[in-house]
């Protein structure tokens, strides 16, 4: 009933102005439909977690629900609307934050919703940014009222406003707007060898850091799967490469990527449905090769790319994740390549790549025996990441600062489940709004991790986010926390669940699938797991 399939073309004018967030009390899909065809923006529903700073991603905050979201409750009646700010507190808090920190335009909003008006009244009386309100010409009382509050006034209706934007900004945007294709290519491009961070070869093997520098300078052995994938690409457009965790899939993805000669090639780590549609819009009908790491974290998004005739797609995933999502690909022709454990002469070939200064005596793999990459590195590389030295590290961090210990434990829990540590999570977790306190805790954690050459670094795209680059460290940390610091880990995970809004957890839609896994929860919390599930 409230879903539309077409719209007034004047709405395309929204693509001409700079937008950071779209907040609405409407439940229809007009603006989302407009943005689904855009080459400048795409909407990202806040229920999926916060949005990193981006010139293309707009945070979408549907205060009363959203008609195309099957999990969204739609608010209609007087009684429901009277309490919607309580039911959707996180959405209203997000609205409050946006109005405080960015100039805001109220367009087509009648100020008849008490729940919304309470938040607006609080921000309008103490504005940090300009607030613009569009009123009809005959709304004299409203115009005078909002002017007295310090708001800027626009006289007109939605139609005339969009027409004005279209007439005013079209020519200007032609001169100043960056080509959307260049934006996409820059965001997802494979970097040049001369523009990547130098990683010593010893660190690659000891700390299991898979970075572009290591690939360009041939640190890892090139396994047969690289040629298998390249050959498969000659006869098929869609490939999924799957295998056990830590079997070298990401390394293989990067090795194939630097060898590909396609004019347009993209390497994507965090694919979403909205991002997939945006990339298709921008590429238009151009032929492109797209690599998607951890591709089954959003299988629907991957299927959208694979169905696009002009795109060749290679996805890389853990086999158990693929098995839980494979129904999403029922009607798509896909070739599969399985990345096996090390076999035959591969262990010795990899051993030859290890710098002599950190080589242990070669631990031979018997003819019929297989081993994982992690096992091989532990057996053949001096001072490599191991459960024992990660345990020692956590012991030292705890002695230095319990807050630093909690930061590292949080970072590993979030990273393990497809998310990332950010300052908003830490502020809620530690119940503080003092960013200097949070920065101090992060600095303590970083300094302790640096002792093992493990990096917790600011995300270059958004400095409110902190990334753990070593997946092996994350994996070993979870094992150590579960085995040796279970009581502390229980408290940390429980506090995260109780204190931190899902809307502050990056990629929450991905995070929640594994972070609250029943097997993990029962091991960690025992009989108390059900109480936490009730809260969730």
Model-derived segments and spans:
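Conserved small helical "lid"/interfacial subdomain of P-loop NTPases
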Residues: 320-321, 328-367
């Amino acid at each position: 009933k409230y879903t539309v399939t077409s719209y007034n073309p004047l709405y395309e004018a929204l693509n001409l102005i700079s937008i950071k967030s779209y907040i609405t009390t409407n439940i229809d899909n007009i603006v989302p439909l407009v943005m689904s065809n855009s080459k400048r923006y795409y909407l990202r529903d806040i229920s999926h977690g916060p949005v990193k700073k981006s010139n293309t991603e707009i945070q979408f905050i549907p205060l009363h629900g959203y008609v195309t979201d099957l999990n969204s409750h739609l608010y209609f009646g007087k009684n429901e609307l009277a309490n919607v700010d309580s039911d959707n507190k996180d959405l209203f808090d997000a609205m409050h934050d946006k109005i405080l920190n960015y100039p805001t335009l109220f367009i087509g909003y009648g100020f008849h919703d008490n729940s919304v008006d309470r938040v607006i009244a609080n921000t309008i009386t103490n504005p940090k940014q300009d607030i613009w309100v569009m009123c009809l010409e005959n709304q004299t009382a409203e115009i005078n009222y909002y002017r007295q509050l310090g708001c800027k006034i626009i006289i007109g209706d939605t139609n005339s406003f969009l027409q004005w934007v279209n007439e005013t900004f079209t020519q200007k945007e032609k001169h100043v707007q960056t080509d959307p294709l260049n934006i996409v290519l820059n965001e997802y491009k494979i970097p040049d060898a001369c523009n990547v961070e130098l990683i010593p070869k010893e660190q690659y093997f000891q700390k299991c850091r898979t970075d572009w520098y290591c690939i360009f300078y041939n640190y890892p052995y090139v396994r047969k799967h690289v040629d298998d994938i390249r050959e498969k690409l000659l006869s098929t457009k869609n490939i999924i490469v799957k295998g056990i965790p830590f079997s070298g899939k990401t390394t293989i993805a990067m090795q194939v990527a630097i060898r590909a000669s396609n004019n347009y090639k993209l390497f994507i780590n965090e694919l979403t449905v909205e991002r997939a549609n945006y990339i298709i819009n921008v590429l238009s009908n151009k032929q492109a090769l797209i690599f998607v790491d951890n591709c089954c974290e959003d299988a629907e998004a991957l299927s959208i790319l694979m169905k696009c005739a002009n795109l060749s797609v290679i996805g890389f995933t853990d086999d158990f994740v693929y098995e839980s999502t494979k129904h999403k690909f029922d009607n798509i022709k896909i070739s599969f390549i399985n990345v096996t454990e090390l076999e035959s002469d591969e262990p010795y070939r990899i051993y030859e790549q290890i710098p002599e200064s950190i080589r242990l005596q070669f631990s031979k793999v018997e003819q019929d025996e297989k081993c994982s990459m992690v096992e091989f590195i532990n057996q053949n590389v001096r001072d490599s990441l191991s459960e024992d030295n990660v345990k020692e590290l956590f012991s030292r961090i705890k002695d230095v600062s319990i807050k630093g210990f909690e930061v590292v434990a949080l970072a590993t829990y979030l990273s393990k489940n497809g998310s990332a540590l950010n300052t908003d999570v830490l502020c809620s977790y530690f119940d503080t709004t003092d960013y200097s306190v949070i920065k101090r805790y992060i600095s303590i954690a970083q300094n302790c991790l640096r002792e093992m050459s493990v990096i917790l670094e600011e995300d270059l795209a958004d400095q409110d986010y902190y990334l753990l680059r070593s997946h092996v460290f994350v994996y070993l940390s979870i094992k150590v926390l579960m085995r040796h610091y279970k009581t502390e880990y229980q408290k940390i995970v429980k506090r995260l669940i109780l204190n931190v809004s899902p809307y502050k957890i990056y990629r929450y839609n991905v995070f929640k699938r594994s972070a609250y896994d029943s097997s993990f929860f029962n091991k960690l919390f025992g009989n108390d797991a059900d109480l936490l599930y009730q809260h969730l």
